[in-house]
Amino acid sequence: MSDRKSYKDLEMVVFDMAGTTLQIGGLIPVALREGFLEEGIELTDEEIRSIRGLSKIEATRNLLEKHIGNPTEDLIQKIHKNFLQKLEMMFDREEVRLIPGAEETFSWLKAKNLLIALNTGFERKYALMILERVGWSDIADTLVCGDEVSEGRPAPDLILESMKRLDCRNPSRVAAVGDTQSDLNAAAEAKVGLAVGVLTGAHSDDQLKLCPHHLIIPGVGDLPKYLS
């Protein structure tokens, strides 16, 4: 896809959080590995890479299916809880940082009267904790979290719920920005007018180019230049 857009063609921009606007991605693999280890399951680096971009509960389910075939819902929830507890402890001692240019891009979009949505696979409790750490509690017009939709990425639910909350009914006037294949696949499923991949997170340029997209840029700080 290669349809160039101006900010004048858009009503809203939907941003992923980890790896796209915030640098917290390095904590997630560690917490996931430790959460599984508590139940005696050791994950490889390749297994952890394979679930990047998926909702955290869906990632847990997929990994358990590979290891034990048919996990119970109780085990899935137990390991997911382990993961979240580990992650919360890491948030207390590790720094969460803004991706360079993210704040400036948000200011630019607001000056153009565009709506901003943040999407994340995290549950709302943890998403709010992360945003508070970086002073972003009120940065977006809406925040849609993994526990507020039926399906996580690569399903389009997070984007569609963002549109619903902000009363944006035409997907062609929506841009979606993310750092994973799941982000771009979700954008395609939602039929957004502009699907943007960024190279500050989980997946490489070559990996992102395997998915439907309109644009791949180094980072969110480059978005205003493209939309001007």
PLM feature segments, named:
Residues 1-10, 107, 123-124, 129-228:
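Asp-based, Mg2+/Mn2+-dependent phosphohydrolase catalytic module
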Residues 117-118, 197:
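Hydrophobic beta-strand core positions in alpha/beta domains
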Residues 3-103, 108, 112:
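N-terminal helical cap/lid subdomain that shapes the substrate entry/recognition surface
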Residues 92-97, 121, 193-195:
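Short, flexible loop segments at the rims of nucleotide/cofactor-binding pockets, characterized by
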